[in-house]
Amino acid sequence: MTTTKKFQQVKDLTVYPSLQPTIEVIPTDGYNGAHRYRLQLCTGFDSKKNTHNYIDKTTTIQFVQKNDDGSITPGLQSEQLALILLDRVKKLNERYPSEYNNIQIEGLTMYLQACKERIDDRINRGVMGELQK
């Protein structure tokens, strides 16, 4: 018998200034939902209502997951998603320069550097790719 995995809203993951939860996970995956996210799509910001407009369509992001039995669920790496965000902010900053964009670029660059350092540490300790701390 196949069990259906149920997505649940994550109430504290909202996009400012909206109060509407638009991100869901499957919290019973053994990682509290850290590998698959379902997101409600947005059509932009409504300046009259001072909030984002969300529609009844979703997209799913699956992160790579090594399971306890050694099997792997293919998916994105966190760094790939961060690189996409960094590329997007840099390109938008070319068209609409902003000090806030520069702060985002700095933050994403710091995140990627921390990822690199963590990977280097795990490689040096011989645990990269293993389910070990």
Segments from the language model and where they lie:
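Short, charged/polar N-terminal "headpieces" of proteins
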Residues: 1-48
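Generic structural signal for short, flexible, solvent-exposed coil/loop and linker residues
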Residues: 26-28, 48-52, 70, 97, ...
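Short, compact, well-ordered microdomains
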Residues: 86-129
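Weak global preference for isoleucine
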Residues: 23-26, 55, 61, 72, ...
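Residue-identity detector for glycine
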Residues: 30-33, 44, 70, 75, ...
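A short, structured beta-strand/loop element
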Residues: 36-92
